[in-house]
């Protein structure tokens, strides 16, 4: 029997938004499909294994700086973390779908946005609660 994994708040953006990171495929599923709401923003490294990153928002609006910081977290927690830049896809969670019978952590999405992010998270405020 698998133990249920809890979603982990990893950071708080410079603008005060909570950022959550799934640290394995089961946490990614829990975070994306049980914890996040439709207007929250979902981030993931493009075409490579990595963590799902969720930014909680009430109305779907985020400042540019929070998009950039969440992108950096997605880059850091991906297979591309040793590269100088990683392409990150992001989209509102309501557009992220799980195909029937798919393995934990596997998703599909369309009409996403992309940004290039440095995997440097040294200046992000880590949650230590």
Where are these regions (language model features)?
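Short, small-residue-biased leader/transition segments that mark boundaries at the very start
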Residues: 3-8
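Phosphate-backbone binding interfaces of nucleic-acid-interacting proteins
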Residues: 12-20, 27-129
């Amino acid at each position: 029997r698998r133990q249920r994994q809890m979603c982990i708040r990893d950071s708080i953006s410079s603008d005060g938004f909570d950022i959550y990171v799934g640290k394995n495929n089961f946490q990614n599923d829990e975070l994306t499909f049980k914890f996040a709401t439709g207007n929250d923003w979902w981030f993931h490294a493009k075409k490579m294994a990595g963590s799902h990153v969720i930014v909680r928002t009430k109305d779907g609006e985020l400042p540019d700086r929070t998009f950039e910081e969440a992108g950096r977290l997605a880059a850091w927690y991906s297979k591309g973390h040793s590269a100088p830049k990683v392409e990150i896809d992001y989209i509102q969670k309501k557009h992220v779908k799980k195909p029937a019978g798919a393995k934990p952590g596997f998703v599909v999405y369309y009409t996403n946005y992309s940004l290039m992010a440095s995997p440097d998270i040294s200046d992000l405020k880590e949650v230590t609660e």
